[in-house]
């Protein structure tokens, strides 16, 4: 009888454990192809360059801030391509509205420089005719309320700082490609 009760208590404690940290988007579904709304406008691309809506939940205990990155590991650079980095998002914020980049970010949030050379969001823009590229959108729960980076920080520098402060992360991935030039 005691063994049965202990087993049931152990099972119940596992079942009641915290839910996983997750991210979703009303504008980009996991595994989908990006629409023109989230494609860069420049560099040979003619998209609307609008940052996606993101919502996250079940951050772990001890979360003091959040960071968001969008990264293309398939860019033919040898080091991928950073499309968006946002840090110092307050712990009480659990979403970014579509188009938040540069105009509607939470107070204190900082956008780093994309690999297009400017701070803010830079949408997808793979080379024409290249295979579909993956765009990994990640929200990080951080154990610090502020990372010491500014708007001139590269994606690599932001990623380095995020790496030392991460409690948990959640990602969704989308793809995009452009037809070969005629």
What is the meaning of each model-derived region?
Residues 4-14:
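Sec-dependent N-terminal signal peptides
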Residues 18-182:
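N-terminus-centered regions that define maturation/targeting leaders and the start
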